[in-house]
């Protein structure tokens, strides 16, 4: 320990002569410049950064090694700093964890503030009630707590993969998807990069100060400096972290902006795709219309070709009938056969084209199915929107319930205020009546709302009936579809029957061939020819029957087509009905919203009424408090004046046996003083009273001396002055008549000023006559003033009655409150009598006070009874409101269930429509297959008919030729041999089932053989 240098006085002294750069950097060299008692002046201007710039190397070494590399005696300081930094890191982690809780607390602050405001308002009301009446304890009405469920909004956090999926769901093109995925990956990689590291370090820091007085300073200064330095390091670290967080925030905002841009692009692309799809739909519909026109044209062409074929067949028959032109007709038949083959090929080519067109139509149908699926998705979106609207309606209902609760609370407040109204005045009793009327109006409005809800329920029931009718129609349509299936099965059976008929035809042809063989064997007999003709006729008849059967089948097909079209129309009508029902439901929703708006308007009107009531009550309370204070002050002043008069009069009794009483019973009465003639009456009366007469004076002998005359003149002057002052008082009384509310105030002021005048007179005079005159005059005047005050009280009562009549016009009467008002009026009359008797006798005044206390107790008991009755009424009203609310909620739940059932029914109808459409497509495909089979059968039938006709004509010609040549020929055997040869050449005798179904090429070869023959 060194000695203190003589230069150091212990006070702050400057040490700027040593530069900062020449000072040592380590604490080991601190002995060269010992500590002083105070910090050096020059270090105050230096920043912390300059002080700690020399310790960066040590800080980096400590951070890299994790241990103290500086070998000195301050290891415990470094350990303390390290522990502080670790504690700061833990505090930062806790702060991050607490930030989440702060976010949750912010949501609760608004609720707490609203609750605080409500508590403040309730406290103010309670204080006001305590000031109004501290004696009466108002019973607390229990608050009815409804079933409230707090809305808990859980914080939904989406991961990056979910956001990526949602963004990619908007994209449909593969190229855009790949670009978007690359951008998303880059952004996610940038998100996943580690944040910038903030290097922290701990070190023992030596503040660069001069140390001169080492013996005086202690080690605590070093410790404080170390702590301050560490705190500054932590502050720098926090600043760096704040900058990093700001950068991250800006990056996230930029990314959000990019996300929003991409989302907008996706929405634009989606809108474009929708527009393109709508255009394609329109073009496909136009193409369908064109294809239908083309199909009709092709059908007309086919009909024309059929007619042409029939004409050709007729011409062929004519040509075949001509015997002379048989060969020529055969050549034409060949040409026509070739032409028919060409037409057949062309027809097959057209059929192939039609098949291709049908394939295209099927592809378009597939596209329409896809569009239908998209429409179904849109329907699901609409359903979701409907559910969202229902949720909004539920929220609105919750708001309405909250408003009802507020209305109930307002009613409770109104009831509490009505208690004070019943105790104090009739005005507030009538305001209670207003509240009852408002409650009745609310009940009526609720009844009207219930009637509207019932009407809406009836409408919903009508809609349900319509839906049931639609279901019945759908069932009928299903039955018709089943009938169509049965008819299709019948058609298939008929096709089988037609095939069987064809087989029978083939059998008939075989029989004909057999008969021909028999004719070949029995050609010698002429009767066999007739049998052959009969059998041929029978076969023709069978062919005719088959043709009729085919025509019947064609008619059945046409009828089926018509029925299918009818079913399609019925389906369209059902869809229109569904759209109409949806529109009706939307209208009902709008009506419900309108009803909710009406309910809100009624709530607002009720709130306005309550505000007006509150204002009226406040005004009445202020008026009543002022009137009471004024009345009590006036009565107290009057009591003091009366007692002072009594004492003064008792003191002024100089004569024995002559006692002047202080009561007003011995005074003469005066009635009906008019306020208009008060001044003139006062002047004349005072002059009469001033004249001395032996009748009026109390003194038996007249004044004889000059002193008495002087006294009398002096008294006369004083009396004149008193008259003038009384006139001034009356003028003041008239001027303040409208300003003052309480009529008792004027009499008190008059008495007070008169007492002052009397004191002034009595102090300067000793005349008893003058006092007696003044006393008599004052008694008369006091009576007149009392009567004037009574008239003013009557005027005030009239004004109050006018106000009551105005309020009664607005509000209805209540029996209980009217009884209370009558009791209050009786109490007021008793109080008036008490006031008049108070001026007469002091004993009666005390007795009246006791009576008034008893009356007040009775009134308080009555008020408690009334409060109980009102409380019961309020509880009943609350119970009814709860019941109506529950009924309303139950009705809303029923409506929700009904809408859910409607949605289910709509979905079921859509499914049934889809099923019917599928059946329809399947039926169409079956009908198309059936028509193709029928056409093939018709072609085979036509071919067989033509071949049979040709053979029949050839046989008839041969028979005719045989008949003609029968007489000419000499040898019948030769003719029969020729007939058999011709039959063999034609190939009739050796026909089989395979030859019946031969193509036209073989037929042409057979026709050529006939022509060669």
Swiss-Prot record:
Q: Does the keyword Cell cycle apply?
A: yes
Q: Which organism is it from?
A: Caenorhabditis elegans
The parts of the chain that form a coiled coil are: 235-525, 564-626, 867-926
Q: Which portions of the sequence form the region Disordered?
A: 1-46, 457-485
- Polar residues bias: where? 19-40
What's the name of the protein?
A: Spindle assembly abnormal protein 7
Q: Quick one: which gene encodes this?
A: sas-7
Q: Name one GO cellular component term.
A: cytoplasm
Function, please? Answer: Plays a role in centriole duplication in meiosis and mitosis. Required for daughter centrioles to acquire duplication competence and become mother centrioles, and for mother centrioles to maintain duplication competence. Regulates spd-2 centriolar localization and affects the recruitment and incorporation of downstream core components. Also required for the assembly of a peripheral centriole structure called the paddlewheel, for centriole elongation and for pericentriolar material assembly. Required to maintain pcmd-1 at the centrosome in early embryos.
Sorted alphabetically, the keyword list is: Cell cycle, Coiled coil, Cytoplasm, Cytoskeleton
């Amino acid at each position: 320990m060194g000695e203190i240098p003589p230069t150091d006085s212990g006070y702050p002294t400057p040490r700027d002569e040593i530069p900062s750069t020449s000072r040592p950097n380590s604490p080991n060299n601190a002995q060269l410049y010992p500590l002083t008692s105070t910090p050096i002046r020059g270090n105050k201007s230096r920043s912390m950064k300059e002080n700690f710039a020399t310790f960066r190397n040590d800080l980096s070494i400590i951070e890299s090694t994790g241990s103290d590399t500086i070998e000195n005696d301050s290891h415990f300081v470094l350990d303390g700093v390290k522990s502080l930094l670790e504690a700061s890191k833990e505090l930062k982690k806790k702060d991050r964890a607490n930030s989440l809780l702060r976010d949750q607390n912010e949501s609760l602050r608004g609720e707490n503030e609203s609750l605080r405001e409500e508590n403040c308002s309730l406290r103010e009301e309670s204080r006001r009630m305590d000031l109004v009446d501290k004696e009466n304890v108002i019973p607390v009405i229990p608050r009815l707590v409804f079933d409230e469920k707090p809305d808990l909004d859980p914080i939904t956090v989406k991961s990056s993969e979910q956001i990526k999926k949602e963004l990619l769901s908007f994209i449909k093109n593969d190229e855009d998807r790949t670009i978007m995925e690359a951008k998303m990956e880059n952004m996610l990689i940038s998100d996943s990069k580690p944040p910038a590291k903030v290097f922290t370090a701990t070190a023992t820091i030596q503040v660069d100060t001069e140390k001169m007085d080492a013996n005086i300073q202690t080690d605590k200064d070093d410790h404080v400096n170390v702590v301050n330095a560490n705190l500054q390091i932590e502050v720098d670290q926090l600043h760096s972290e704040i900058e990093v967080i700001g950068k991250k925030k800006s990056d996230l905002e930029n990314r959000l902006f990019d996300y929003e841009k991409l989302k907008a692009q996706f929405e634009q692309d989606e809108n474009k795709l929708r527009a393109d799809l709508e255009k394609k739909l329109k073009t496909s519909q136009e193409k369908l219309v064109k294809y239908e026109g083309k199909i009709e044209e092709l059908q007309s062409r086919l009909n024309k070709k059929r007619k042409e074929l029939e004409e050709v067949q007729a011409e062929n028959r004519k040509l075949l009938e001509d015997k002379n032109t048989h060969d020529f007709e055969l050549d034409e038949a060949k040409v026509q056969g070739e032409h028919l083959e060409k037409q057949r090929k062309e027809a097959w080519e057209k059929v192939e084209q039609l098949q291709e067109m049908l394939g295209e139509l099927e592809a378009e149908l597939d596209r329409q199915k896809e569009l239908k699926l998209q429409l179904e998705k849109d329907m699901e979106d609409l359903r979701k929107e409907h559910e969202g609207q229902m949720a909004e309606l539920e929220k609105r209902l919750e708001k309405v319930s909250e408003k009802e609760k507020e209305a109930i609370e307002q009613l409770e407040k109104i009831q509490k205020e009505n208690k004070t109204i019943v105790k104090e005045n009739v005005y507030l009793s009538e305001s209670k009546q207003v509240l009852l009327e408002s409650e009745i109006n609310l009940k009526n409005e609720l009844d009207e709302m219930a009637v509207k809800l019932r009407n809406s329920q009836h409408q919903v029931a009508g809609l349900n009936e319509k839906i049931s009718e639609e279901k019945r129609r759908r069932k009928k349509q299903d039955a018709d579809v089943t009938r169509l299936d049965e008819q299709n099965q019948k058609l298939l059976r008929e096709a089988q029957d037609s095939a069987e008929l064809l087989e029978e035809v083939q059998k008939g042809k075989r029989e004909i061939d057999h008969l021909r063989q028999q004719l070949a064997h029995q050609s010698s007999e002429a009767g066999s020819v007739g049998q052959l003709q009969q059998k041929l006729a029978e076969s023709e008849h069978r062919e005719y029957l088959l043709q009729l059967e085919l025509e019947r089948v064609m008619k059945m097909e046409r009828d089926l087509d018509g029925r299918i079209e009818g079913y399609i129309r019925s389906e369209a009508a059902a869809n229109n009905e569904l759209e109409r029902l949806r529109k009706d439901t939307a209208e009902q929703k709008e009506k419900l919203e309108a009803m909710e708006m009406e309910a809100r308007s009624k709530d607002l009107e009720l709130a306005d009424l309550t505000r007006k009531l509150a204002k009226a009550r406040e005004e009445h309370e202020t008026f009543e408090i002022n009137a009471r204070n004024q009345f009590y002050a006036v009565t107290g002043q009057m009591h003091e004046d009366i007692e002072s008069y009594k004492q003064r009069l008792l003191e002024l009794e100089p004569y024995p046996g002559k006692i002047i009483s202080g009561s007003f019973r011995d005074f003469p009465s005066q009635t009906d003083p008019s306020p208009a003639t008060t001044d003139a009456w006062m002047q004349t009366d005072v002059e009469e009273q001033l004249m001395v007469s032996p009748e009026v004076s109390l003194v038996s002998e007249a004044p004889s001396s000059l002193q008495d005359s002087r006294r009398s003149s002096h008294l006369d002057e004083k009396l004149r002055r008193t008259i003038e002052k009384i006139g001034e008082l009356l003028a003041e009384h008239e001027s303040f008549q409208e300003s003052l509310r309480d009529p008792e105030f004027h009499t008190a002021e008059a008495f007070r000023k008169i007492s002052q005048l009397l004191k002034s007179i009595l102090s300067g005079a000793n005349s008893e006559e003058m006092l007696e005159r003044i006393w008599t005059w004052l008694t008369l005047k006091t009576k007149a003033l009392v009567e004037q005050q009574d008239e003013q009280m009557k005027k005030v009562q009239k004004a109050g009655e006018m106000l009551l009549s105005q309020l009664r016009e607005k509000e209805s009467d209540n029996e209980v409150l009217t009884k209370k008002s009558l009791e209050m009026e009786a109490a007021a009359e008793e109080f008036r009598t008490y006031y008049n008797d108070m001026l007469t006798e002091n004993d009666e005044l005390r007795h009246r006070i006791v009576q008034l206390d008893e009356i007040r107790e009775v009134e308080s008991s009555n008020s408690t009874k009334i409060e109980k009755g009102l409380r019961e009424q309020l509880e009943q009203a609350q119970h009814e409101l709860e019941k109506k609310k529950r009924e309303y909620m139950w009705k809303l739940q029923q409506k929700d269930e009904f809408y859910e059932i409607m949605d289910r029914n709509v979905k079921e109808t859509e499914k049934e429509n889809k099923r019917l459409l599928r059946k329809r497509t399947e039926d169409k495909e079956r009908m198309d297959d059936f028509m193709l089979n029928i056409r093939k059968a018709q072609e085979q039938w036509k071919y067989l008919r033509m071949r049979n006709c040709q053979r029949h004509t050839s046989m008839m010609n041969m028979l005719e030729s045989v008949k003609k040549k029968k007489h000419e020929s000499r040898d019948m055997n030769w003719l029969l041999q020729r007939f058999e040869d011709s039959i063999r050449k034609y190939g009739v005798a050796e026909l089989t089932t395979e030859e019946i179904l031969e193509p036209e090429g073989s037929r042409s070869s057979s026709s050529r053989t006939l022509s060669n023959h």
